[in-house]
Amino acid sequence: MIISNGLSRVCVAGVLLGLSLGASAREPVTLASAQIQRTGFGVPHIRANDERGLGYGIGYAYAQDNMCLLANEVVTVSGERSRFFGPEQATLEERNNLASDVFFTWLNTPQAVATFWNAQTPQIQQRVEGYVAGFNRYLKDHGTPAQCQGAWVRSITPGDVVKLTRRLLVEGGVGQFAEALAGATPPGVTAGVQASARRFEVAAANQQRFALDRGSNAVAVGRDRSFNGRGMLLANPHFPWVGGMRFYEMHLTIPGQLDVMGAALPGLPVINIGFNQHVAWTHTVDTSKHFTLYRLTLDPKDSTRYLLDGKSLPLDKTTVTVQAKQPDGSLKAVSQTLYSSQFGPVVQWPGKLDWDNHYAFSLRDANLGNDRVLQQWYAMNRAASLKELQTSVHALQGIPWVNTLAADDQGQSLYMNLSVVPNVSQAKLAQCSDPRAGLQLIVLDGAHSACAWDIDPRTAQAGIFAADQLPQLERSDYVQHSNDSAWLANPKAPLTGFSPVISQDHIGLGPRARFAVQRLQSLESKPISVTDLQHMVMDNEVYLAGLVMPDLLTFCAKHLGADAAALQPLCTSLKTWDQRANLDSGLGLVHFINLMEHLQQIPDAWRVAFDPAQPLTTPRGLAIDREPVATALREAMLASVADVNKLGLTANSRWGDIQVSGQTPIHGGPQALGIYNAMQTVPRADGKREVVSGSSYLQIVTFDDNGPQAQGLLAFSLSSDPASKHAKDQTQAFSEKKLSPLPFTDAQIKADPQYQQLRIKE
């Protein structure tokens, strides 16, 4: 039925269960009910009286906006892509369907899903059950959009939400080794899942891009630097614009218990990044290790047995079977035997982690034991102070692979590198790891049980570091982070002395972090304002240009030689470029991107090398007087000219003509150049570059006597359905650099010009 009043349209959709068929019908039993209020850009404000009702509203609203996205991800995490789409097709991450299915069938076994579910609190279970009911209700009432017609779109279960959550957990670990796990086979045995060299190249690229596609910037300002003596927070996570890591903006309220707004990942009925009445927080991908590899010494008599403390042990075998669609539409069962040691599954990466007659490699992922992640964000959503938020993270240790930065209404700022990290001390690394492997991948000796992770009885799970052993810093001026180690979250208070598995110090800072610290230092003469934080992102300064442009222009003036005529247009474009990545920035930006991409592969290209004593100002300059660098630069210039000509770009081309989302021009650019507003793109057939990851949910939160005052937007918009009016509206606002106030109070919500209301119950 539809109920209307003068202020809003209220739609009540309900199946009234429990009605007596007798003459004296009793009151209907309401299993779940919620109110969904929508404001500008369609942002849902979901209100309910209990957890089940709140979950019901979240699931219903999410289905309205992103049904096809979630349905696709459910197929993926259920290991059913081959069944519906064929084994040779690929996921959004360019992963072969069959390898993906074998991996997720291994990861999300019925036992693993049940164990995770049983570890949840009643409140979390009720929230998830409500979410499932709400999503299914919308699917039942409205069917599937044109975007995703097919048998693969189905009702979901609480188990599906668990599977989605477990996929999130292993993104920083074994999830990066899906192909290596799915195809691992003993020497001389043919794998059921064949992985080509190309697939491993893609996997390697995805692994290297993990921190780029899921990077972030964050600044938390304390009372000493804030314009009003209260805390301030800039949240600028860089996350994918498509797929299973695409944020969703929402506001959740249970009167008297919960009032929190922000963004959540698909399938999660909690806020991951956001704010409430007293606290605002965000996350940045950390540099801590969340898994280690173990090199197994194999039994010389049998390559499916390994030696541990001199004893021969068999590798455990598990057979995984996937249904694969054939060209004629029939299904064929494809089986693969997977192996594991007591340390974890065996992974095989040709040329990198080979399984031969002498050695094999197991991977132990700390987050496979993390069943606390939903409870963690549930607790953070309710935190009434910075101390309460910090205490919850110490107690639960549920943050998987990110740092946390937060500020509160009392004017404190906080940085915590408190994620799930294997307890491997510096001493154990020295004893058990091969120094030739370096620190990019930690490879421990699997032949000795003494090399197992240490156990601290104070931890939330066995084998990880205790919270008080991890980096954290509370300040009244500021903390910042841009995906570097914990070392210089605030240069006035360096965080040092940790195991390299946790955080390294006295290593080079990334250019975004250098930009952020120098920008914050430049503001020391006055209080930091909301506008200052907004400009950090929206100015689109190319930090690296300031470090090398004088040398580039000198090279143009003195070192072009016989190529002077061919390279003069490039040099002119560099000289006239504004050294920003705005929509109207000129062709010099394209050339600069090309040149730096090439030069960053050249050893000793810096004129002044990194100096640990001067981490904020080194390295800098280009060593154009060194012949190898000069030669490489000249070659890069010629290649860039050829590339620009091939794309049909001219001196009048602008960045907004090149970097786009659909037809919408997008500012920002590659994070490697120190562009705070980082964007990752892929080339399109028409010569443009399509944004696939980068600035996503953007929020700037301050506090006053009335509570939080927030502005922000979701750069890729709320809905992934191209037919939705909310598929591109915030993207256009982002293109125009227009952040909007985020309505938080009931009065602000109802005063919104786009206010609509929907009541649902079941």
Question: Whereabouts are the PLM-identified features?
Answer:
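Bacterial N-terminal signal peptides that target proteins for export
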Residues: 2-11
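Sec-dependent N-terminal signal peptides
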Residues: 10-18
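N-terminal signal peptide c-region/cleavage motif recognized by signal peptidases
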Residues: 20-22
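C-terminal/peripheral segments of proteins
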Residues: 26-554, 560-563, 567, 572-762
